[in-house]
Amino acid sequence: MKIEKLIIKDFRSHALTKVNFSSGINLIIGQNGSGKSSILDALLVGLYWPSKPKDLKKDDFERINGSGTEITVFFEKGNVKYQIHRNIGRGLAFVKYHDGSSWKTLETGQKPVRDWMEKLVPYDVFLNAIYIRQGEIDAILESDESREKVVRQVLGLDRYENSYKNLLDVRKEIDARIKAIEDYLKSTENIDELIGNLEKELTSVLREINEISPKLPELRGELGGLEKELKELEKTAEELAKARVELKSEEGNLRELEAKKSGIQSMIRETEKRVEELKEKVKELESLEEKAKEYERLSRFYRNFTEGINRIEKLLATYSQQAENLRERIDELSKKEARVKELLKEKEGLQKELGALEEDLKAYQRAKELMANLERLKKRLTLSEEEIEKLEAEIQKARERKEEIMKELEEIGSRRGELKSIAGERNKALMELKKAKGRCPVCGRELTEEHRKELLEKYTAELKEISAEMKELEKREKKLRAELVEVEKTLKKERELFALKEVLEQIRETEEKLKEYDLEKLEEANEKAEELKKKLAGLEGEIKSLEDEIKKGELLKKKLALVEKKLRELEEERASLLGELKKLGFGDVKELEERLKELEPAYKRYIELRPARDELKREEDLLKSLKLDLTAILKEIEKTSKRVEELRKRVEELEKSYDKDRHEELKGKTRELSNELAGLEARLKSLEERRDEVKASLEKLREEKETRKEKAKELEKLKKARERVQRLREKVKAYKNLLKEGALAKVGEMASEIFEELTEEKYSGVTVKAEENKVRLGVVYNGKEYGLGFLSGGERIALGLAFRLALSLYLAGEISLLILDEPTPYLDEERRRRLVDIMQRYLRKIPQVIVVSHDEELKDAADRVIRVSLENGVSVVREAEVG
């Protein structure tokens, strides 16, 4: 697999990032927090989202205020080019391949694309064999158990472990099936006995069915004759009962009709009496009709007249008052015009006084700005003048101390190089002395055991002295570097010092400028100007108010004309109403009121009698309707009387033809025969059902007997399969251990070479030993094996890195891509330089390597350098030149 290009949009600090990768070593470099590791996380999300990686959640990587995360990965696998695109926010995804001319879609949708990628390169293979993550070195150094877990994941030994466990599950499943079959065979041991018992029961049931079947036709024939005679008697009894009920009903109807006839005759008499009374009332009503009409006409006029006069009187009073008020306001306007002229003259004088103060006001404004600026500058000055001078002296002292420290560190580095060279020579001499025979490889004379021992002791003592001096140098270097950090902190304050000095100079300049102004005089001028402005504003407000009122003068005159017109119209309306009163023959309202009082009794009697006409009409209609009802009821009584006579004759005839005793006798005989027949039929049905059940049970038992034979054969096969599965489990376990030991032996050899490079051959090898659920790691020093506790902190990190690189290099024949995320944490400067040589020597065996780091030294080993920086909160990617 080879990664060609990665496009990232709105992922953490990346707004829109495009990264191109090539064959060889690709280095992604940048400071912590610049977004370089986010490129690797985006690659994982692009390939395996949504279920992998599990520790990445959508909210963790979506860019704030972004339009939505999108990732596109272009890569090659098996000489075929692919691209995977994911739009996380919208839940869209696709994978395409290039057929040589254009891109063709393979899958769409987040889950289908993830499943396709999982088949092409399983996530566990990518994460364990291809991707060396931050913190994985710590897991290698943490314990023998955690180291074994890393080895198991990277080498893919989990597959064999899972196979071993899965085979145990298979064996358990086979055991469960064996037990189930054995239980089944035991539970069906008596099947032949059950078949014999059911065959006997079937013979007995068939015999009883043959005895009952002939009796049923005879009983059914006898019962049919009785039921026919019984049916005829029941029909006669039913007709008799129906005739009696109908007769009783008709007799009741006849009584009701007679009662209705009497009621209607009584109502006719009462209605005729009311009709005569109402005719007299209608005559009186007609005699009062003329007076009633006059009363209604005069009453309407009186109501309209009084309402109109009252309304006019009220409006006349209102409009008269308005006219008086308007005339007074118009008279006041001339006084206000004179007042406006006085105020304008006063305003002109104030404006002249304010103009004379203009220059002083401008000077006062400039002085205020200088004072405000001085206040701001003093707030920015965080140190006093004495403290600034003290800080300047500290920085000068720190600059001198830094030169001294750098010079001493250079001397320490030079001395360490000399000691390493001597130690290398002594180690080489020791190795040669241990292997040498005959002549001494040091001096060339004959090599005796005494001479060998003497030289070995001498060189070993020298190596111990060198080691002690190296530790002292390392201790001194550590102390100097710690001091250098503090010195650098002081030197970083130099920029702050420059800024403070500049602020101090600005304060002095501002104070000098302020001395040029007479602030007391300028403040008095400003106060006077404010007072004048206040007076001027008051005058302008009063002038505007008066001018607005003067403008309203014409409107007031127009309004007065309208009010006077309205008063004339109201007077005319009042005169018109009085004219109508005279036309009716009345001199004033009192005469009209007296005439109404005179007509009122006749009008009230008229109102009282007015409903009589309608009542007379209703009563006459009712009388007519009652007479029609009476005629109809008389006809119905005659008809019902005839029906009652006919029904009485029909009942007498039916009573003569019906024999009640014979009816009861037939009921008893029919019931007895029906019960006997039902009992035999029920018994026959029960026997037939039992016959069918026994036959079905026999069929099932015979099938069960055949099944028993098949199960017995299956049991033998399962027992043999269990033995084969157990043998296969043992083989899988043995092969896993063999593979693990062989792989760790090769990994140990490669780790030894890398570790020797990292420690400049201080250690002559790395030991790797596999145990149950453990992998022990050690080093060889001066021919002896030591545990990890023998190593310094930096050497432990170097060993962990060497071991993890060896694991990936072991798989180099199977993988074409390796990713390292921050491989240099805790490595000192010298070991980082050694790592560059290791990358050039070993990692070039892998077609494509992607390294993420903040160490500039790694650039020397890279074929392509991609620099990541954070600018205004956004990650920016640039390709850098390779030296």
Curated annotation (Swiss-Prot):
<feature type="binding site">
    <location>
        <position position="134"/>
    </location>
    <ligand>
        <name>ATP</name>
    </ligand>
</feature>
<feature type="domain" description="Zinc-hook">
    <location>
        <begin position="395"/>
        <end position="492"/>
    </location>
</feature>
<feature type="binding site">
    <location>
        <begin position="790"/>
        <end position="795"/>
    </location>
    <ligand>
        <name>ATP</name>
    </ligand>
</feature>
<dbReference type="InterPro" id="IPR027417">
    <property type="entry name" value="P-loop_NTPase"/>
</dbReference>
<dbReference type="Pfam" id="PF13476">
    <property type="entry name" value="AAA_23"/>
</dbReference>
<keyword id="KW-0175">Coiled coil</keyword>
<feature type="coiled-coil region">
    <location>
        <begin position="218"/>
        <end position="420"/>
    </location>
</feature>
<feature type="binding site">
    <location>
        <begin position="32"/>
        <end position="38"/>
    </location>
    <ligand>
        <name>ATP</name>
    </ligand>
</feature>
<keyword id="KW-0479">Metal-binding</keyword>
<keyword id="KW-0067">ATP-binding</keyword>
<feature type="binding site">
    <location>
        <position position="12"/>
    </location>
    <ligand>
        <name>ATP</name>
    </ligand>
</feature>
<comment type="similarity">
    <text>Belongs to the SMC family. RAD50 subfamily.</text>
</comment>
<dbReference type="GO" id="GO:0005524">
    <property type="term" value="F:ATP binding"/>
</dbReference>
<dbReference type="InterPro" id="IPR003959">
    <property type="entry name" value="ATPase_AAA_core"/>
</dbReference>
<dbReference type="Pfam" id="PF04423">
    <property type="entry name" value="Rad50_zn_hook"/>
</dbReference>
<dbReference type="GO" id="GO:1990391">
    <property type="term" value="C:DNA repair complex"/>
</dbReference>
<dbReference type="GO" id="GO:0006281">
    <property type="term" value="P:DNA repair"/>
</dbReference>
<keyword id="KW-0547">Nucleotide-binding</keyword>
<feature type="binding site">
    <location>
        <position position="443"/>
    </location>
    <ligand>
        <name>Zn(2+)</name>
    </ligand>
</feature>
<dbReference type="InterPro" id="IPR038729">
    <property type="entry name" value="Rad50/SbcC_AAA"/>
</dbReference>
<keyword id="KW-0227">DNA damage</keyword>
<dbReference type="InterPro" id="IPR003593">
    <property type="entry name" value="AAA+_ATPase"/>
</dbReference>
<feature type="coiled-coil region">
    <location>
        <begin position="620"/>
        <end position="741"/>
    </location>
</feature>
<keyword id="KW-0862">Zinc</keyword>
<dbReference type="GO" id="GO:0004529">
    <property type="term" value="F:DNA exonuclease activity"/>
</dbReference>
<dbReference type="Pfam" id="PF13304">
    <property type="entry name" value="AAA_21"/>
</dbReference>
<comment type="function">
    <text>Part of the Rad50/Mre11 complex, which is involved in the early steps of DNA double-strand break (DSB) repair. The complex may facilitate opening of the processed DNA ends to aid in the recruitment of HerA and NurA. Rad50 controls the balance between DNA end bridging and DNA resection via ATP-dependent structural rearrangements of the Rad50/Mre11 complex.</text>
</comment>
<keyword id="KW-0234">DNA repair</keyword>
<dbReference type="GO" id="GO:0016887">
    <property type="term" value="F:ATP hydrolysis activity"/>
</dbReference>
<dbReference type="InterPro" id="IPR013134">
    <property type="entry name" value="Zn_hook_RAD50"/>
</dbReference>
<keyword id="KW-0378">Hydrolase</keyword>
<feature type="binding site">
    <location>
        <position position="440"/>
    </location>
    <ligand>
        <name>Zn(2+)</name>
    </ligand>
</feature>
<protein>
    <recommendedName>
        <fullName>DNA double-strand break repair Rad50 ATPase</fullName>
    </recommendedName>
</protein>
<dbReference type="InterPro" id="IPR022982">
    <property type="entry name" value="Rad50_ATPase_archaeal"/>
</dbReference>
<dbReference type="GO" id="GO:0008270">
    <property type="term" value="F:zinc ion binding"/>
</dbReference>
<dbReference type="GO" id="GO:0006302">
    <property type="term" value="P:double-strand break repair"/>
</dbReference>
<comment type="subunit">
    <text>Homodimer. Forms a heterotetramer composed of two Mre11 subunits and two Rad50 subunits.</text>
</comment>
<feature type="coiled-coil region">
    <location>
        <begin position="452"/>
        <end position="585"/>
    </location>
</feature>
